[in-house]
Amino acid sequence: MAAEATAVAGSGAVGGCLAKDGLQQSKCPDTTPKRRRASSLSRDAERRAYQWCREYLGGAWRRVQPEELRVYPVSGGLSNLLFRCSLPDHLPSVGEEPREVLLRLYGAILQGVDSLVLESVMFAILAERSLGPQLYGVFPEGRLEQYIPSRPLKTQELREPVLSAAIATKMAQFHGMEMPFTKEPHWLFGTMERYLKQIQDLPPTGLPEMNLLEMYSLKDEMGNLRKLLESTPSPVVFCHNDIQEGNILLLSEPENADSLMLVDFEYSSYNYRGFDIGNHFCEWVYDYTHEEWPFYKARPTDYPTQEQQLHFIRHYLAEAKKGETLSQEEQRKLEEDLLVEVSRYALASHFFWGLWSILQASMSTIEFGYLDYAQSRFQFYFQQKGQLTSVHSSS
């Protein structure tokens, strides 16, 4: 989910109030003045950016004057702040140092120091395998990465058949990797349990949105979700866990026919396959590029249809099962089972990012309607859960 963002789950309109029992929006007083997202580097951060580039990149970066360093905000994350740092044109390169880099400054740290270390190791491994940007520097506040001429996909592009097929293939390749991390799938519920505990420990704020835990009985509901997923077979693979449009780059100068690159691996871990696919389908609904509060839109009707899901699943299986010969019956069974698996794990996506967003609201300095977003995700969770129950009851 970590991208840029606007409105709550509804018909696509921006703003409005949420009803507790559905995704419909009702008209409510415009008590929040319109404001646009601000994204700039403070004087102190500019000074530190200059120092980091000098120390970690060397070459011409050691000769650039502070006032010559070009620093531009990059549309990026709800977890991190991203900036493009460039050398001035008149300053020649000394060696092989890059002329521009991406500076990533960590936002509110929810994973802990150990997870940041693992992410840096993971980032370096993927770079060595040419599956991600190069890593130029790591420091407590963030890191310097290769700046890749590209643009992130747009939410509406996720539904384009050619791009959807390419994303499915890319995801299957990612799932096929062997990584030097624990293969036990503790990440999903381990992280959600930690988030829930942290939320319960938050001091009272008086904000009605912070009563989401009680409103939805989230502690009990997590137990219900766990039981459902324990009865849902899903292989454990190396998952990205956040394949949304902002984390999929369309390369401007691809070195081969593969024009897409996955980025932002901070949530990657061994996890259940169904979560990665279900999470991606949920992201068809959310557009994080809106420039006014609450900086996201939600269009529940954009959730992929069964036909669109099958299109994705067939291309995923074509890559994951490459070299295997399957009968038509075996292929059909795989597709049907995966549809059920993904629809159930999509619930976990809503639950995970809903908890994440409540926590972010309490600590993040990034402008985003985190509490609105949390409520949207939980409402969508209960709507989709109800649909699953209806299908099960009628079958």
From Swiss-Prot:
InterPro entries referenced in this protein's UniProt entry, alphabetically: Kinase-like_dom_sf
Keywords, alphabetical: Acetylation, ATP-binding, Congenital muscular dystrophy, Disease variant, Kinase, Lipid biosynthesis, Lipid metabolism, Nucleotide-binding, Phospholipid biosynthesis, Phospholipid metabolism, Transferase
GO terms for MF: ATP binding; choline kinase activity; ethanolamine kinase activity
Binding sites annotated in the UniProt record for ATP: 75-81, 104, 146-152, 244, 264
Enzyme Commission designation: 2.7.1.32, 2.7.1.82
Pathway named in the protein's UniProt entry: Phospholipid metabolism; phosphatidylethanolamine biosynthesis; phosphatidylethanolamine from ethanolamine: step 1/3
Modified residues (N-acetylalanine): 2
PANTHER family in alphabetical order: CHOLINE/ETHANOALAMINE KINASE, CHOLINE_ETHANOLAMINE KINASE
Protein name: Choline/ethanolamine kinase
UniProt source species: Homo sapiens (Human)
